[in-house]
A protein has these predicted regions:
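Single conserved hydrophobic/aromatic residue that forms the stacking wall/gate
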Residues: 1-7, 11-13, 251-257
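Small-molecule pocket liners
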Residues: 7, 124, 243
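Long, internal stretches of domain cores in catalytic or enzyme-like folds
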Residues: 17-18
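Functional-site microenvironments in short loops/helix caps that host divalent-cation chemistry
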Residues: 22-226
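A short catalytic or substrate-binding loop motif that flags glycine-/basic-rich loops and adjacent residues
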Residues: 154, 237-239
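Short proline/glycine-enriched turn/loop segments at secondary-structure junctions
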Residues: 200-204, 230-237
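Short, structured beta-strand segments at or near domain termini in extracellular proteins/domains
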Residues: 239-250
């Protein structure tokens, strides 16, 4: 009887705390948020209202001709949700095959992205190492906007296939140009002045601006530099922003050999 009374009092106490806003922060709550799983197909129209982009609007996300093109029209929140889904999908397979689980997939931090973009060339202006935008044959080395209103001199008007142009020395394609990329990091114009060199990442839940790197097909050369920074709001999708995922890879020395 005493135990039953104690349980009843405990239940009543919890109900009272749930009704009382002043004590509500003491209770464990699960925060849920609904996120669209499909790209925003209207970004081609919304980003460029006076341009004839109906073919991209109608076909980019569905026609087989675009199956090797980078995904765009994805907000930062959607990109993070995809990383979580990919982790769950991969580890479900690992469990089924009795294999060890992998670390979480995620967006790269701003510092990780720049390290990868440099491709082992610390002083490089662009991912290919040189300060020039043309190769020795006079061909552009990335998909961007060479001049005001000129989108076609690099043989690409919009985004192109993900493995277009040459990769950097880490064998990564289009680290500059084609589509810009979300990073995990929150944007602060003065972040480099006070972040730790051991963990150079700004990740603030209250900061809605997220760092975007790499430049895109609609950007001038300045944004293609591996040191250039830009941002977009985390709930905004664009026709020129995509993403790539990373995760910490663990392996034994035997596997490395």
């Amino acid at each position: 009887t005493d135990n039953r009374r104690q349980r009843q009092m405990c239940i009543r106490d919890r109900l009272e705390r749930a009704k009382n806003p002043q004590s509500r922060d003491r209770l464990p709550f699960i925060k849920k948020e609904e996120i669209e799983i499909y790209p925003d197909t209207t970004v081609w129209i919304k980003d460029f209202n006076y341009s004839y982009n109906e073919p991209m609007h109608n076909d980019y996300f569905s026609h087989p001709a675009y199956q090797d093109y980078p995904v765009v029209g994805i907000s930062w929140k959607q990109a993070v949700a995809f990383c979580n889904w990919r982790t769950h999908y991969k580890n479900s397979y690992q469990k089924e095959k009795n294999k060890p689980l992998v670390n979480n997939f995620r967006l790269p931090t701003e510092a990780e992205w720049e390290y990868a973009a440099r491709g082992g060339i610390p002083a490089g202006t662009y991912p290919w190492g040189s300060p020039y935008l043309l190769n020795d044959r006079g061909c552009f080395l990335a998909n961007f906007k060479p001049l005001r209103g000129d989108y076609a001199s690099d043989q690409a008007v919009y985004a192109v296939e993900a493995k277009s142009f040459l990769p950097n020395d880490y064998n990564l394609y289009n680290m500059s140009g084609n589509v810009a990329e979300w990073t995990e990091s929150s944007y602060d114009p003065g972040a480099y002045e006070y972040v730790s060199s051991l963990n150079p990442n700004m990740s603030l839940n209250d900061e809605k601006r997220k760092v975007v790197r790499g430049g895109s097909w609609k950007d001038v050369a300045y944004f293609l530099r591996v040191s250039s920074r830009d941002y977009e709001y985390q709930d905004t999708a664009r026709s020129y922003i995509g993403f790539r995922t990373v995760h910490c890879l663990l392996y034994t020395s035997d596997a490395a050999d």
